[in-house]
Design a protein with these regions (language model features):
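Acidic, proline/glycine-rich low-complexity intrinsically disordered segments
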Residues: 1-225
């Protein structure tokens, strides 16, 4: 997870959600293997040595990043570290308006690929160039939802966290009714409640309807959150 260097509680959801969204972006590239969000969740809120974490995860490189939000500005400092040699493969500082988190995420993913000197296929380049939504507010609600859902799945199993995720996914959909990832996330919430025995009677049908909407708006959706 990214480190919240400003210790701003209102921005804490970016810690897991930004890392999670970058993972989702990079997972579309066949030539690299990216560890899923489930394995990074345990590092959230902790001081972690990147090389030690990399050895534990059995990866060749680790992205280490921190962010500071001040007013409407968001600054991310990031570096990609070679786990074996300790060499920095890529490092950069990326500034963005707080309302343009989409551009920030896209920038991080593309600069990592540049640092690794990877050549993309035409289809991979097309996928990376396609935004899940152009609505910045919808994307922020989606990130909040992912943070709540990640907390529910990996840390608390508290129904309130899942309920909060559902509310955020629904707000994202209200802001962008064609937001496939938000429908997919909403479906995952309902399905997880069913699997964990926390469900309401209609949750199964809600999950099915949400996933159907997700694939209606994006038939190539690779990952259901």
């Amino acid at each position: 997870p990214f480190q919240n260097l400003s210790q701003d509680a209102a921005s804490a959801f970016y810690e897991f959600a930004l890392a999670d969204s970058v993972i989702t972006e990079l997972a579309q590239i066949r030539s690299i293997i990216v560890r899923p969000s489930s394995v990074i969740a345990k590092y959230q809120g902790k001081e972690v040595d990147p090389r030690e974490a990399g050895r534990e995860l059995r990866v060749h490189a680790v992205l280490s990043a921190g962010f500071i939000r001040a007013g409407d500005k968001l600054r991310v400092t990031a570096q990609l570290l070679d786990v074996v040699s300790g060499d920095i493969l890529w490092s950069d500082r990326i500034d963005a308006e707080g309302s343009d988190i989409l551009a920030l995420q896209d920038g991080i993913a593309h600069r990592i690929l540049e640092g690794l000197r990877l050549e993309l296929t035409d289809l991979e380049a097309e996928k990376l160039g396609k935004r899940a939504t152009d609505n910045a507010e919808a994307w922020e609600e989606y990130l909040r939802a992912r943070d709540h859902f990640g907390r529910f799945i990996f840390r608390t199993i508290d129904a309130e966290d899942c309920d909060a995720a559902i509310a955020c996914f629904k707000r994202a959909i209200e802001l962008d009714p064609h937001f496939a990832l938000a429908y997919s996330g909403l479906g995952a919430c309902y399905a997880t409640r069913v699997f964990k025995g926390l469900c309401e009677p209609e949750d199964y049908s809600y999950a099915d309807a949400s996933f159907s909407k997700a694939f209606l708006y994006d038939q190539h959706l690779a990952v259901a959150p």
